[in-house]
């Protein structure tokens, strides 16, 4: 298994798919990284030379990924909560943030139903 950005990349997958194992890199970004590195998207990770792997590592290092990205997202949410704005309040209460209805259909965000005590 190859390691890029502290993540073990699966050897048997195509390069464009294998790069999506890194948090913060999806299909579009991985395609751009492969294109910039001059690697065919259909080539498998196990078939790449060490020089090609190094070009992939350089391409990935230009993006904010893994721990840094997780920390950045967490800090953005914390900042909203500290500001006391509407979005921060919704995060704090564990409710949908982007205007969805909550009378019904908010179970994912609200969690399991709580029984009403009589």
From Swiss-Prot:
InterPro entries: Rbsml_uS13_C, Ribosomal_uS13, Ribosomal_uS13-like_H2TH, Ribosomal_uS13_bac-type, Ribosomal_uS13_CS
GO molecular function: rRNA binding; structural constituent of ribosome; tRNA binding
Source species, domain of life: Bacteria
GO biological process: translation
One Gene Ontology CC term in the entry: small ribosomal subunit
Disulfide links within the chain: none
Alphabetical keyword list: Ribonucleoprotein, Ribosomal protein, RNA-binding, rRNA-binding, tRNA-binding
Any single Pfam family the record assigns to this protein: Ribosomal_S13
UniProt region (Disordered), positions on chain: 94-118
Annotated signal sequence range: none
Assembly behavior: Part of the 30S ribosomal subunit. Forms a loose heterodimer with protein S19. Forms two bridges to the 50S subunit in the 70S ribosome.
Xref: NCBIfam families: uS13_bact
Function (record text): Located at the top of the head of the 30S subunit, it contacts several helices of the 16S rRNA. In the 70S ribosome it contacts the 23S rRNA (bridge B1a) and protein L5 of the 50S subunit (bridge B1b), connecting the 2 subunits; these bridges are implicated in subunit movement. Contacts the tRNAs in the A and P-sites.
Entry similarity comment: Belongs to the universal ribosomal protein uS13 family.
Protein name: Small ribosomal subunit protein uS13
Taxonomic lineage: Bacteria, Pseudomonadati, Pseudomonadota, Betaproteobacteria, Nitrosomonadales
Gene name, Swiss-Prot/TrEMBL: rpsM
């Amino acid at each position: 298994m190859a390691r890029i950005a502290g993540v073990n990349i699966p050897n048997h997958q195509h390069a464009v798919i294998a790069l999506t194992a890194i948090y913060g890199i999806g299909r579009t970004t991985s395609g751009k990284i492969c294109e910039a590195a001059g690697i065919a998207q259909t080539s498998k990770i196990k078939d790449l030379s060490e020089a090609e792997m190094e070009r992939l590592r350089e391409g990935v290092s230009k993006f904010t990924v893994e721990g840094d990205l997780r920390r950045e997202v967490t800090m953005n949410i914390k900042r909203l909560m500290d500001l006391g704005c509407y979005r921060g309040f919704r995060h704090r209460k564990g409710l949908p943030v982007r205007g969805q209805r909550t009378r019904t259909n908010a179970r994912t965000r609200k969690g399991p139903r709580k029984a009403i005590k009589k």
